[in-house]
A protein has these predicted regions:
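WD40 beta-propeller repeat fold
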Residues: 2-205, 211-230, 234-247, 260-278, ...
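Intrinsically disordered, low-complexity regions in plant nuclear regulators
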Residues: 302, 314-317
Length: 367
């Protein structure tokens, strides 16, 4: 077991167990479970700046390397668009889709982001919705780049179906994270984007308009809706300086925006976070000190109140409760974390110490 839990909670609180630890010879950019399998994908950058994609399978209490493939550029982010098709963003601004059973030729490849004059620009974040994955309707992929642009792609065409960027090129900020949500029908899509200056923006794809924006005061490392395929409920935002924000998306106040709760976590940057697929009110956060923490969001008695003077509805934020002791998973910052969609509590973690770890978090179904 790893992590600490008080004696009073030791019989009921979730516990962290390391299933296997795997050293790699590259810097991991992202890890993802291959849908419906006991295998996971690890992608990153080799010392010579080439990209590498590896598939590992859990078997006999170990991680066994199934395949390893080199690609031209270092991989920065990934998302599965079908059970065996993965979309990769790289350090040279390309978006590529590969079949995990063959990486010799991409199924789709386009330069998604580039600076003026064709200068090098990386894809900083990626997400997808629709197709055979979460949500309904056609497959759409969103990418955010260091050129300050957020673009939505349909793999059936090589041009973006939507591009969000500031009119003034001097105001462009690095986009560090993107996420889809609100995919309740074939036409309904909402995307969230976080930027290095703390900006958080929500856009509606159906109307191609910015719905809401705010500033989290610190660079935004991760945004994630609690579910992609339901009506908007909550948005999780993690930032530099150890901050976590959870916005209640049910009620938008014209002046105050969405209500949110603020929490200070870890002792450094909260690099990433992930909602538990089996319970959208539970999520894990990963810190710059290598810590992993589990939280549960608790709703208030009333999520909406009326302003006595104007009569306008205002949201009421909930509270965050740590439900497990902090686990010292790695010696360096945790770069990527992914829950298994079918096995509650099974997770894979990648950190900057060039190590992949498969963890089992127990008792989550009892929370």
């Amino acid at each position: 077991m790893i992590g600490e839990t008080s004696r009073a909670d030791s019989l009921t609180a979730p516990q962290f167990a390391e299933y296997h630890c795997q050293r790699v010879q590259y810097t991991t950019g992202d890890v993802q479970w291959v849908p419906g399998t006991a295998s996971f994908l690890s992608a990153g950058t080799k010392p010579n700046d080439e990209g590498i994609v590896q598939i590992y399978q859990l078997r006999d209490s170990r991680c066994h390397l199934v395949s390893s493939h080199s690609v031209p550029n270092g991989i920065t982010c990934s998302t599965f668009v079908r059970d065996t098709h993965v979309a990769l963003g790289d350090s040279d601004g390309f978006l590529s889709i590969f079949d995990v059973e063959r990486f010799d030729q991409p199924l789709f490849r386009v330069r998604a982001h580039a600076r003026e004059g064709g200068r090098k620009c990386r894809v900083g974040a990626i997400d997808c919705v629709g197709g055979t994955m979460e949500g309904v309707g056609a497959l759409e992929i969103v990418t955010g780049g260091s050129d300050g642009c957020v673009r939505v792609w349909d793999p059936r065409t090589r041009s973006p179906v939507l591009c969000l960027e500031p009119e003034d090129a001097k105001q462009r900020r690095d986009c560090w994270t993107v996420a889809f949500g609100g995919a309740t029908s074939a036409s309904e899509r909402v995307l969230a984007a976080g930027f290095d200056n703390g900006d958080v923006k929500l856009a509606c794809l159906r109307t191609s308009k910015l719905v809401w924006h705010s500033n989290a005061r610190n660079g935004v490392c991760k945004v994630q809706f609690d579910r992609k395929d339901t009506a908007l409920n909550k948005l999780l935002v993690t930032t530099l300086e150890s901050r976590i924000r959870v916005y209640d998306l049910r009620t938008l106040h014209q002046q105050e925006g969405f209500a949110y709760t603020l929490w200070k976590a870890h002792s450094g940057t909260v690099w990433t976070a992930a909602h538990l697929p089996q319970n959208r009110d539970i999520f894990a956060t990963c810190g710059g000190n290598g810590e992993l923490t589990i939280y549960k969001y608790k709703y208030p008695r009333e999520r909406v109140i009326k302003d006595k003077q104007t009569g306008e509805k205002r949201g009421v934020p909930g509270t965050l409760q740590p439900v497990a002791g902090k686990a010292d998973v790695a010696q360096q910052p945790i770069r990527s974390f992914a829950w298994h969609r079918d096995k509650c509590g099974l997770a894979v973690v990648a950190s900057f110490d060039q190590t992949l770890r498969v963890l089992i978090v127990t008792r989550l179904s009892n929370l």
